[in-house]
């Protein structure tokens, strides 16, 4: 039987997943699954188990499960530390390495985690738009605001000048709150609710813009200005030559 790696990109809205071989080749198209991020712990664990089994090809045996997971998270020990960020609150304090080992039957050391923005950064530095970057800032805006910092093709080491702890600035002070409350899906929904009278996510807002809605365009422009303001302190501190979003 073919040995495969089950790889998941875990977001707050959806989870993208696919099986890969030892060379990193996709063995099937990437599939999209609902994250169910607001569900209870048992439902969430069952959802992950269903995804594991759904993406494993017939006549194949999984030898490792690799997950890009949003932080805060104890990646070394596999413990979820997300709380109060509108996603996966029910998993707070849960040892997901142990839980996924029990679900899949794999040894705990065969369950690996990495920060989702860090995974994005590594991919861009190895294969994408940051292959020639000396200093790169990576930002992933979704359910929250994920971030990572790269130096000469590697993730910036802890303590690198201009890099916040763990490479996170979602919790940095911004206006009357923090970055994550503004540069996120809920931030965009709040802004569109104030400007348009109805909360809209990025896709719905883009559809209105495509239809010629000038108020929706102004809302997106305002969100972009907020993003620029939120990034400015990070850019001034780190001085990147490349910004990937």
Predicted feature locations:
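ATP-binding/phosphotransfer module of carbohydrate and carboxylate kinases, centering on a glycine-rich
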Residues: 1-64, 73-79, 100-109, 125-137, ...
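Short beta-strand segments
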Residues: 9, 66-70, 114, 138-144, ...
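A short acidic/small-residue loop/turn micro-motif
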Residues: 34-36, 88, 163-165
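A charged helix-plus-loop insertion that forms the helical arch/lid used to bind
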Residues: 78-93
